[in-house]
């Protein structure tokens, strides 16, 4: 961690003293962190993320990392001259593409994220949702209105899945050994088929199954914004549902807040959508009064 980020030695000491009550509050707790977006592609932010996760472990918190990798998948598909096809804004994942998705997510990206944490002094182990039967998946069901017939029809997205069941035993085995699990969101179906799973959905489901104290969702926006584009610091699940209904929450933020609501309804104490572009975003959220993102409670 670059001490220049925190000013003088006196300022660093003041920051640590201020953080102590929050460290005590979360000691022994499980925190699931969804990592992706711009923070993953920026070298300096990536190093800071690794340091943040290592520090969480050092002060007695049990971090569990779930990562995305959309840009890296896109890059590999281009290199292999595999054309992406989208239906209603969702990528269709055929048999050839799901092999690439698994190779990139469970291989290149997974080991890169684990490496960031290991270089910061902690011990991280990269796995995917297929390992130990962690993420049991089912085919994602989506429908859309046909523009010609105006009839609702099922969309065939190929091997795009969603979590059906989370078996947390492999996570407990790793955390019990003092290791930090780094999880690629690739799941296994009942038929043995590999499924590509949205990282937000995987993180929310894993946090719920673990009964995590916090779910941190790193994004490329400050959090949930109101109609004046100002950050909403805290929302209840009911507030979120009302915000979707009245149009305050729109677009790509809807599935993110829905994952958070689902997680808190499954027992997570709080889910936070925060800006991963902010240096040391995880530490600022966990160890400062009020945090920096939008906290969603049940």
Swiss-Prot record:
GO molecular function, one term: acetylglutamate kinase activity
Top-level EC class as recorded in UniProt: transferase
InterPro entries (UniProt xref): AceGlu_kinase-like_sf, AcgluKinase_fam, ArgB, Asp/Glu/Uridylate_kinase, Glu/AcGlu_kinase, NAGK-C
Marked site positions, Transition state stabilizer: 34, 256
Key words of the record: Amino-acid biosynthesis, Arginine biosynthesis, ATP-binding, Cytoplasm, Kinase, Nucleotide-binding, Transferase
Chief location: cytoplasm
Pfam families: AA_kinase
The reaction(s) this protein catalyses: N-acetyl-L-glutamate + ATP = N-acetyl-L-glutamyl 5-phosphate + ADP
GO cellular component, one term: cytoplasm
Pathway(s) this gene product operates in, as recorded in its UniProt entry: Amino-acid biosynthesis; L-arginine biosynthesis; N(2)-acetyl-L-ornithine from L-glutamate: step 2/4
Annotated positions binding substrate: 69-70, 91, 196
Residue runs in coiled coils: none
GO biological process, one term: L-arginine biosynthetic process
EC identifiers of the protein: 2.7.2.8
Record keyword Cell inner membrane present: no
Subcellular location per the Swiss-Prot or TrEMBL entry: Cytoplasm
Recorded family membership: Belongs to the acetylglutamate kinase family. ArgB subfamily.
Summary of the function given for this chain in its UniProt record: Catalyzes the ATP-dependent phosphorylation of N-acetyl-L-glutamate.
HAMAP family: ArgB
Name of the featured protein: Acetylglutamate kinase
Organism per entry: Granulibacter bethesdensis (strain ATCC BAA-1260 / CGDNIH1)
